[in-house]
Amino acid sequence: MNKGVMRPGHVQLRVLDMGKALEHYVELLGLIEMDRDDQGRVYLKAWTEVDKFSVVLREADEPGMDFMGFKVVDEDSLNRLTDDLLNFGCLIENVAAGELKGCGRRVRFQAPSGHHFELYADKEYTGKWGVSEVNPEAWPRDLKGMAAVRFDHCLLYGDELQATYELFTEVLGFYLAEQVVDADGIRLAQFLSLSTKAHDVAFIHHAEKGKFHHASFFLDTWEDVLRAADLISMTDTSIDIGPTRHGLTQGKTIYFFDPSGNRCEVFCGGNYNYPDHKPVTWLAKDVGKAIFYHDRVLNERFMTVMT
């Protein structure tokens, strides 16, 4: 059921060296720098995104994700969702408008998995970057690197998947698109969506709370993914795996690391979903094929390296 949460809006990542991080996210991934603030944070967006930013980089002593934000339709929805979060048992932090430049007030909470999320209704509308809103060209001609199209989702590792599932489905209005279950039917991975996309956020069971696996960015075509792989080699960027295809979600993908060790994904394609679709289920004994459809064997680094 729609509860007023629209889509992923932003992710704030911790990086060890801002200069090196910007080489990665701007020059390689192709995000556009939009602003900086007095805390030293840098605000980035992909060119098709209409709001001011979708990625915030913060220099810190250890890498990882500070929080992921979702945009809601209006202030009334934000107020109602705040009450629902409190009734669910979440502790709420109200973050003032302007704490993130160009963003309205945010309501932050912690999921049972240990990850921090936030909801907001307002963010400065800047339109797509480099193209007009009237008679727009197909794409800007001065994009860099992989020319990421949009910030798409995050994959997160933590425990208490069932309670996290209940929070995201019953309170926030997500639905289960795909899952991995063990022989007893216990869910080990859950891919949750707000839209017709394959997923907007995903969780995999892990003993330690609050771990970050990757932030993902959409590309248009398989040829774009192959070109991204070329750029990864040209820049001696640390690669995890790919190009390959997922069984889960059907995305065609490649994974690589920023200089701080945060994992990134660029992908194209993927399943679509409508409200009458039943969740796709993968069995844990076949998880190799679910994750890497071609190799059918798990890459140990993919399952064990996180920030």
Curated annotation (Swiss-Prot):
<keyword id="KW-0479">Metal-binding</keyword>
<dbReference type="GO" id="GO:0043640">
    <property type="term" value="P:benzoate catabolic process via hydroxylation"/>
</dbReference>
<feature type="domain" description="VOC 1">
    <location>
        <begin position="7"/>
        <end position="122"/>
    </location>
</feature>
<feature type="domain" description="VOC 2">
    <location>
        <begin position="150"/>
        <end position="269"/>
    </location>
</feature>
<comment type="subunit">
    <text>Homotetramer.</text>
</comment>
<keyword id="KW-0677">Repeat</keyword>
<dbReference type="Pfam" id="PF00903">
    <property type="entry name" value="Glyoxalase"/>
</dbReference>
<feature type="binding site">
    <location>
        <position position="214"/>
    </location>
    <ligand>
        <name>Fe cation</name>
    </ligand>
</feature>
<dbReference type="InterPro" id="IPR017624">
    <property type="entry name" value="Catechol_2-3_dOase"/>
</dbReference>
<keyword id="KW-0223">Dioxygenase</keyword>
<keyword id="KW-0408">Iron</keyword>
<dbReference type="InterPro" id="IPR037523">
    <property type="entry name" value="VOC"/>
</dbReference>
<dbReference type="InterPro" id="IPR004360">
    <property type="entry name" value="Glyas_Fos-R_dOase_dom"/>
</dbReference>
<dbReference type="InterPro" id="IPR000486">
    <property type="entry name" value="Xdiol_ring_cleave_dOase_1/2"/>
</dbReference>
<dbReference type="InterPro" id="IPR029068">
    <property type="entry name" value="Glyas_Bleomycin-R_OHBP_Dase"/>
</dbReference>
<keyword id="KW-0058">Aromatic hydrocarbons catabolism</keyword>
<comment type="pathway">
    <text>Aromatic compound metabolism; benzoate degradation via hydroxylation.</text>
</comment>
<dbReference type="Pfam" id="PF22247">
    <property type="entry name" value="Diox-like_N"/>
</dbReference>
<feature type="binding site">
    <location>
        <position position="265"/>
    </location>
    <ligand>
        <name>Fe cation</name>
    </ligand>
</feature>
<keyword id="KW-0560">Oxidoreductase</keyword>
<keyword id="KW-0614">Plasmid</keyword>
<dbReference type="InterPro" id="IPR054560">
    <property type="entry name" value="XylE-like_N"/>
</dbReference>
<dbReference type="GO" id="GO:0008198">
    <property type="term" value="F:ferrous iron binding"/>
</dbReference>
<feature type="binding site">
    <location>
        <position position="153"/>
    </location>
    <ligand>
        <name>Fe cation</name>
    </ligand>
</feature>
<dbReference type="GO" id="GO:0018577">
    <property type="term" value="F:catechol 2,3-dioxygenase activity"/>
</dbReference>
<protein>
    <recommendedName>
        <fullName>Metapyrocatechase</fullName>
        <ecNumber>1.13.11.2</ecNumber>
    </recommendedName>
</protein>
<comment type="similarity">
    <text>Belongs to the extradiol ring-cleavage dioxygenase family.</text>
</comment>
